[in-house]
Amino acid sequence: MSVEVVKRFKGNIEPGDHPYLQGPWSPQHEEVNADDLVVLEGSVPTDIDGVYLRNTQNPLHQALGRYHPFDGDGMIHLAAFRDGKVQYRNRFVKTKGLAAEIEAGERLWAGLMEDPALSKRPGWGAHGALKDASSTDVVVHAGKALTTYYQCGEGYRMDPLTLDEAGIPDWSPEDGISAHTKVDEHTGELLFFNYSKKPPFMHYGVVDKNDTLVHYVPVPLPGPRLPHDMAFTRNYAILNDFPLYWDPEALKRDKHVVRFYKDQPSRFAIIPRRGQPEDIMWFEAEPTFVLHWLNAYEDGDEIILDGYFQEDPMPTNYDGAKPGYERMMSYLDQHKMGTKLHRWRFNLKTGKTTEQRLDDRIM
């Protein structure tokens, strides 16, 4: 095995006992290429030919206050498989925010758990004061890897084989691209949504296999929301409006206070993949919040959607957490949120929703 250090980045993370800055979460500040990795046990099948890409959070600079793992700078890790051998390389996602902080030698933007007033420059995303770290997801579309940010960012492209930079997509809209885009392997299309604090509060878009934006429509909501993921079937896209969102009264004071409104229903927008706002069918269901979807498909007049239902989207503080991190640790504990596999069935003829718990285990 040979290892080449391509570049070392100078960071200023202070040593400490933060649970998400040590062990497997320790920041990695080197970009490397490694050929012919050592196989510790067994062998790599010779018929595997392709690459595995993973997006991770690797903060380079000390947080302005309390660090949350979602704040870390994006870093793509690549494992390439061919002829029974594996190569590895990693690269930072060279976002505008990261470039500015490298030049300044310090953190310039507040994070998820910090006061937005700490930000030293205007930010990105629905929040408006955060750094677009492009550290949430990575998909491959139109021959390029596309990285995205959890509260809507510009999206950054890379070569999926070399991780060379390929810039921001020309079609990236003003309100950005959501955390999780979806690629239809049958049509080559990329489906996405975004959201903001201004009407209509959400948009839905389609980018064709040639990387051209061919569809972009508003999905009107009652107010600012915090959707994270979407799903799709052969003919429909599925978006959501969950009763977990910023307190409207606090927003008037520029305070981003997340609350769970348990007396309000979950709402699902089902729209034909090239549909208009008037084509949207809205369905209601039990109040919850779903961070990620598992699957969706059509079955006769129904659309079946599987995802992870949170029994308590606003859990109590995490006992034993480091002072100041009680809330963060509670959100990162699936047991406290009661996250369980759930199924929704939407009848397109009757407009009714039926629900079913698929497993009582915490997922």
Model-identified regions with their sequence ranges:
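Beta-propeller domains
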Residues: 1-363
